[in-house]
Curated annotation (Swiss-Prot):
It comes from Prochlorococcus marinus subsp. pastoris (strain CCMP1986 / NIES-2087 / MED4). Transmembrane segments: none annotated. GO terms for biological process: translation. PROSITE patterns: RIBOSOMAL_S8. One of its GO terms (cellular component) is ribosome. It comes from the Bacteria. Part of the 30S ribosomal subunit. Contacts proteins S5 and S12. This is Small ribosomal subunit protein uS8. One of its GO terms (molecular function) is structural constituent of ribosome. Keywords: Ribonucleoprotein, Ribosomal protein, RNA-binding, rRNA-binding. The gene is rpsH. The lineage of its organism: Bacteria, Bacillati, Cyanobacteriota, Cyanophyceae, Synechococcales.
Length: 133
C-alpha cells in the first residue's frame, strides 16, 4: 500500500511505539524523516538515530526516551499541522509557542527543518509540520 503522507506515518509510528513502551521504532527512511528525527533528538525527545539498510529498503531506527521509574514517555503528544490537503505556513511572528514554550513546533524552512525556537532566532518562517510535547 502506498503512503501519501510519510510525515504522518512517522509520527503515528513513534506515538504507537511510545504508548506500548517500546525501546525503539523503525520508520521508512527519507531525507525529511531524518531531518525531523534530528530535531527531535536535539530537543531531547528521542535518544538515538540509526540508519539501516540501503536503497528503497532503508529504515531509520529511533531510540525512544522515557522518564521516571514507571517509564513515562517523554513524547506525550504529536500532532500533524500542515497536511497534504491543507498546507500551513507562518512567518517569524506567526510561529506558535507550543504549550507556552514547553513543547516544540517543527518547521520546514528555506534553511532546512528546525524547531520553532531556532527559526525565531534566525528570523525565518516556513511550513509548520507538527507539534510535539
Amino acid at each position: 500500500m502506498s503512503n501519501h503522507d510519510p510525515i504522518s506515518d512517522m509520527l503515528t509510528r513513534i506515538r504507537n511505539a511510545s504508548q506500548k513502551k517500546h525501546t525503539s521504532t523503525a520508520i521508512p527512511a527519507s531525507k525529511m524523516s531524518l531531518s525531523i528525527a534530528k530535531v527531535l533528538q536535539k530537543e531531547g525527545f528521542i535518544t538515538d538515530i540509526n540508519e539501516e539498510g540501503e536503497g528503497y529498503k532503508s529504515q531509520i531506527v529511533l531510540g525512544l526516551k522515557y522518564s521516571g521509574k514507571n517509564k513515562f514517555p517523554t513524547i506525550r503528544s504529536m500532532q500533524r499541522v500542515s497536511k497534504p490537503g491543507l498546507r500551513v505556513y507562518k512567518n517569524t511572528k506567526g510561529l506558535p509557542k507550543v504549550l507556552g514554550g514547553l513543547g516544540v513546533a517543527i518547521v520546514s524552512t528555506s534553511k532546512g527543518v528546525m524547531s520553532d525556537r531556532d527559526a525565531r532566532k534566525q528570523g525565518i518562517g516556513g511550513e509548520v509540520l507538527c507539534y510535539v510535547y
